UniProtKB/Swiss-Prot annotation:
Catalytic reaction list: guanosine(37) in tRNA + S-adenosyl-L-methionine = N(1)-methylguanosine(37) in tRNA + S-adenosyl-L-homocysteine + H(+)
Name the UniProt record assigns to this protein: tRNA (guanine-N(1)-)-methyltransferase
NCBIfam families per record: PRK00026.1, trmD
UniProt subcellular location: Cytoplasm
Organism encoding this protein: Chelativorans sp. (strain BNC1)
Length: 235
């Protein structure tokens, strides 16, 4: 089954962008996933092709209009479309590895890229848009966030990664950050590869990696560490 991605945007020229190279690019060429863009402005009805207006109640910036966006969504995703409808938004649900994995098992996604000060709340509710955030910062628009989401999803599609075990060993899959990685040369500017990693003792290697992952997570992501600790039965 091909994972079908449809992106609604004011800047379709931003796609596929980096999604056309490396793993994602090869997977798209192989038909593992497909990408369609929809120009939101094509669904404006006035001579200026307006897609935004001033915010109700006053304030800075402009807001994307519900009527224009609804027509674009209805065109891209009719009622029988089983794909989730996502709106890239800084106030959305955090994009996590578990959510990415959930999306990767589905038929695809319809992704709306917001611009300006935001999107009229009425179309978010009327078209059941799930708001998704890639982090606690503001971008110029939802397009870079959509690229991040799609890159994360595509690499988990069947056959995309050469080593199927790679995805299971990465950061977040176990609830922890990934352990440090090393490769040749054995010595770099006086720094050695940890001896345990060249010992050939797989049990000790696994123990070292687990301990390092726990330490890194505890130091750098106390939020993840708390969730991991609770899941392991801690208090």
């Amino acid at each position: 089954m091909t994972f079908r991605a449809t992106v609604l945007t004011l800047y379709p020229e931003m796609f596929p962008g980096p999604l056309d190279i490396s793993l994602a690019g090869r997977a798209r060429s192989a038909g593992t996933w497909s990408l369609e863009t929809v120009q939101i402005r094509d669904f404006a009805t006035d001579k200026h092709r307006s897609v935004d207006d001033t915010p109700a109640g006053g304030g800075a910036g402009m807001v994307m209009r519900a009527d224009v966006l609804a027509r674009a969504i209805d065109h891209a995703s009719p009622e029988e479309d089983a794909r989730p409808r996502l709106l890239m938004s800084p106030r959305g649900k955090p994009l996590t590895q578990s959510f990415v994995r959930e999306l990767a098992t589905g038929p695809g996604a319809v992704i709306v890229c917001g611009r300006f000060e935001g999107v009229d709340q009425r179309v978010i509710e009327a078209r059941c848009l799930l708001e998704v955030s890639v982090g606690d910062y503001i971008l110029s628009g939802g397009e870079p966030a959509a690229i991040v989401l799609l890159d994360a999803v595509v690499r988990l599609l069947p056959g995309v990664m050469g080593n199927e075990s790679s995805g299971a060993e990465e950061s977040f899959e176990s609830g922890l950050l990934e352990h440090p990685q090393y490769t040749r040369p054995q010595t770099f500017e006086g720094r050695e590869i940890p001896e345990v990693l060249t010992s050939g003792n797989h049990r000790k290697i696994a123990e070292w990696r687990s301990a390092e992952a726990e330490q890194l997570t505890r130091e750098r992501r106390p939020d993840l560490w708390l969730g991991y600790h609770r899941a392991k039965g801690g208090t």
